[in-house]
């Protein structure tokens, strides 16, 4: 099955070479890290993005401390990362099971750490509308606790997961970091407050941070049960099993879908940059393109149907979700210029890798 989908994909899609200067910059940083071991803290380490960060950093010979309360993270993600690595590299990982809403956990985790990659949060716009108190507790109190703990531990850099939801009702495309609208959900409010707190900590305490506004990140270890940008894994599972798919709205809603390897790259570049002008900034993390839900379905259907011979056609349309924006597309010129970011995967390459991972899970 996997060999079939690989041959189909690569006949039509060839990955572009990494000859540009931005990609060379990232390659140099990874090469340098292998021989220059640092201590990293990843909050939300058992989550989708957190576990991908863990895999990359351990593979680069780094020491990693991880924090997770397993409310949305999954121990299976950590087990999968362990299966990909040598026992020597895996021994560089220490897990602290705890919650970032507990300041004691945060201070313990930050001890002797060089870089913090703060991913822990309660994601999902619908969840925040249903339970704004829990979202506020995790995303604002937890964030503030981590800022205090990182400040007191004198970490070199605090990198955190911001969100494209911060753009709110601002309609103009592409989205540029310095122009935002009114938040459309409690989740969006919490992520904007994170940016405000990070800025205040720089002004008040001289603490350096970088915020990364993720645009619909997807990829391996994002399951159909994931609360964050769940449309892709839900649809993959449904198409594979020839089950019904629901499209919110008329199918023309569009997103700047960003494969998880691009998000990992952004975190590493942000943590290690020596460009002083790049510090204490907010950056879009995306590919600078957008795909409608209807086109996303067609792409996934094309990838999966040719492998399973299911010819999926069970599609139904329903109302728009509360709090959702109509269109989203990022301007990535700022992160490209200041952090030398260059996406390794666009939508087609990312979907191929994601579908391949899902097929491995169901074999």
Identify the residue ranges that each predicted region occupies:
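Residue-level signal for the nucleotide or nucleotide-sugar donor/cofactor binding architecture
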Residues: 73, 101, 130, 138-141, ...
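N-terminal Rossmann-like NAD(P)+-binding domain of SDR-like oxidoreductases, especially those catalyzing
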Residues: 1-217, 267, 271, 341, ...
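Hydrophobic alpha-helix immediately C-terminal to the catalytic Tyr-X-X-X-Lys motif of short-chain
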Residues: 193, 197, 201, 231, ...
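Short alpha-helical segment within the cytosolic histidine kinase core of two-component systems
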Residues: 83, 203, 237, 302-305
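A glycine/serine/threonine-rich, flexible loop-to-helix segment
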Residues: 173, 224-233
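Heptad-repeat alpha-helical coiled-coil signaling segments
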Residues: 145, 222-223, 253-255
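C-terminal substrate-binding subdomain of Rossmann-fold SDR/epimerase-dehydratase oxidoreductases
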Residues: 24, 33, 40, 59, ...
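Residues in well-ordered alpha-helical elements
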Residues: 104-107, 114, 126, 133, ...
């Amino acid at each position: 099955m996997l060999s079939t989908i690989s041959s189909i994909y690569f006949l039509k899609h060839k990955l572009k070479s990494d000859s540009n200067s931005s990609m060379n910059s990232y390659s140099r940083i990874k090469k340098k890290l292998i021989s220059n071991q640092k201590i990293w803290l990843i909050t939300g380490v058992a989550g989708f993005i957190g576990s991908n960060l863990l895999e990359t950093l351990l593979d680069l010979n780094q020491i990693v401390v991880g924090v997770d309360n397993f409310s949305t993270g999954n121990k299976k993600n950590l087990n999968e990362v362990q299966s990909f690595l040598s026992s020597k590299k895996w021994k560089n990982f220490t897990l602290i099971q705890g919650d970032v809403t507990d300041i004691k956990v945060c201070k313990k985790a930050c001890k002797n750490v060089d870089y913090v990659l703060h991913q822990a949060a309660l994601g999902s716009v619908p969840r925040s509308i249903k339970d704004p108190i829990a979202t506020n507790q995790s995303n604002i109190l937890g964030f503030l606790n981590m800022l205090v703990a990182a400040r007191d531990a004198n970490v070199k850099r605090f990198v955190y997961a911001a969100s494209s939801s911060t753009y709110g009702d601002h309609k103009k495309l592409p989205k540029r970091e310095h122009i935002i609208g009114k938040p459309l959900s409690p989740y969006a409010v919490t992520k904007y407050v994170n940016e405000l707190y990070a800025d205040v900590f720089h002004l008040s305490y001289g603490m350096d941070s970088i915020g990364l506004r993720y645009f619909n990140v997807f990829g391996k270890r994002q399951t159909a049960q994931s609360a964050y940008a769940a449309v892709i894994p839900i649809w993959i599972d449904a198409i594979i099993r020839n089950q019904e798919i629901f499209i919110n709205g008329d199918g023309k809603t569009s997103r700047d879908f960003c494969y998880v390897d691009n998000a990992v790259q952004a975190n590493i570049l942000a943590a290690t940059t020596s460009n002083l002008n790049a510090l204490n900034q907010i950056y879009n993390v995306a590919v600078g393109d957008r795909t409608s839900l209807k086109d996303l379905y067609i792409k996934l259907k094309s990838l999966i149907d040719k492998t399973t011979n299911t010819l999926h056609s069970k599609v139904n349309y329903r109302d728009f979700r509360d709090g959702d924006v109509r269109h989203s597309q990022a301007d990535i010129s700022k992160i490209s210029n200041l952090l030398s970011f260059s996406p390794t995967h666009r939508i087609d390459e990312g979907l191929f890798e994601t579908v391949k991972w899902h097929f491995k899970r169901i074999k």
